[in-house]
């Protein structure tokens, strides 16, 4: 099986063309491939499939390193767009794809950055999903001896965003796994720790469900900005600084889609016998 290794700001992927290759990935195989000592090693596996709808270009599937399938990965979406162009699967600059939960348009810019229409953030608890009596801008959550205030949003996948004074000292490794699998998130969640520098700049670390802390999380950056704007902390255009680099997020508020712009890097092509 041929594959490519790619990354978006250090969030790394194994990308596989299932348009011209017949492939099947069991959870066990994915875990074996994800092993950084005995396999290829990656945060997520991205699979390019033929479109289910003739109006679209491709179907986009995402699997975490633990073998679970998820509906959204923003950094992966940028790599997906570069991959299909690099491999000659399309020469379009605006690429329409379906995901497990919806549709996206991926736009490759002249300088090879990728701008992704992530759709409109959804704050309705049942759509996240998140167990709450009603929608609020902030929720109180308790996990073991910890009590935190957070915002909750879906970017096609569930996110919990906590504002912190300093991301460098945030309790990512302690609170991350506790909140990721909290009973109020029936499908688990990605946990973002956001430091607001000013209305145009945030620093962010994300503990991703099924992957742990990663160098960057595109949908997590989108979620953090959406929550920050909802809470009146941020403007419509925000630079998000993650451990792996920066993303630019634009959201004009309710009724509008959110856009993420950032790089996608091809590292190498490989072949593996399954």
Swiss-Prot record:
The active site is at 73 (proton donor), 217 (proton acceptor). Gene3D superfamilies: Diaminopimelate Epimerase, Chain A, domain 1. Substrate binds at residues 11, 44, 64, 74-75, 157, 190, 208-209, 218-219. The keyword Iron-sulfur does not apply. Keywords: Amino-acid biosynthesis, Cytoplasm, Isomerase, Lysine biosynthesis. One of its GO terms (biological process) is lysine biosynthetic process via diaminopimelate. InterPro entries: DAP_epimerase_AS (IPR018510), DAP_epimerase_DapF (IPR001653). Pathway: Amino-acid biosynthesis; L-lysine biosynthesis via DAP pathway; DL-2,6-diaminopimelate from LL-2,6-diaminopimelate: step 1/1. Its EC number is 5.1.1.7. It is found in: Cytoplasm. GO terms for cellular component: cytosol. The record marks 159, 208 as: Could be important to modulate the pK values of the two catalytic cysteine residues. The record marks 268 as: Important for dimerization. It comes from the Bacteria. It catalyses: (2S,6S)-2,6-diaminopimelate = meso-2,6-diaminopimelate. GO terms for molecular function: diaminopimelate epimerase activity. Signal peptide: none annotated. Its main location: cytoplasm. Belongs to the diaminopimelate epimerase family. NCBIfam families: DapF. Homodimer. Catalyzes the stereoinversion of LL-2,6-diaminopimelate (L,L-DAP) to meso-diaminopimelate (meso-DAP), a precursor of L-lysine and an essential component of the bacterial peptidoglycan. This is Diaminopimelate epimerase. The gene is dapF.
């Amino acid at each position: 099986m041929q594959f490519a290794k790619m990354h978006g700001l250090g969030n790394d992927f194994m990308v596989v063309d299932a348009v011209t290759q017949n492939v099947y990935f069991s959870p066990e195989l994915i875990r074996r491939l994800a092993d950084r000592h005995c396999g290829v090693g990656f945060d997520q596996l991205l699979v390019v499939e033929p479109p289910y709808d003739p109006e679209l270009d491709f179907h986009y599937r995402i699997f975490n390193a633990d073998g679970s399938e998820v509906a959204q990965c923003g950094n992966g979406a940028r790599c997906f767009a570069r991959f299909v162009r690099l491999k000659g699967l399309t020469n379009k600059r605006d690429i329409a794809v379906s995901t497990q939960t919806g549709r996206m348009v991926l736009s490759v810019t002249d300088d090879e950055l990728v701008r992704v229409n992530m759709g409109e953030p959804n704050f309705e608890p049942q759509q996240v999903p998140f167990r709450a009596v009603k929608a609020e801008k902030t929720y109180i959550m308790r996990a073991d001896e910890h009590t935190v205030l957070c915002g909750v949003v879906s970017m096609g996948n569930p996110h919990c965003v906590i504002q912190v004074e300093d991301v460098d000292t945030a309790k990512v490794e302690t609170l991350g796994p506790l909140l990721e699998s909290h009973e109020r998130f029936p499908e688990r969640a990605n946990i973002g720790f956001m430091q607001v520098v000013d209305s145009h700049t945030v620093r962010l670390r994300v503990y991703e469900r099924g992957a742990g802390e990663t160098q960057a999380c595109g949908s997590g950056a989108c979620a953090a900005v959406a929550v920050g704007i909802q809470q009146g902390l941020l403007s419509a255009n925000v630079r998000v600084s993650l451990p792996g680099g920066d993303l630019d997020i634009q959201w004009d508020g309710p009724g509008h889609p959110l856009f993420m712009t950032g790089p996608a890097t091809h590292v190498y092509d490989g072949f593996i016998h399954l």
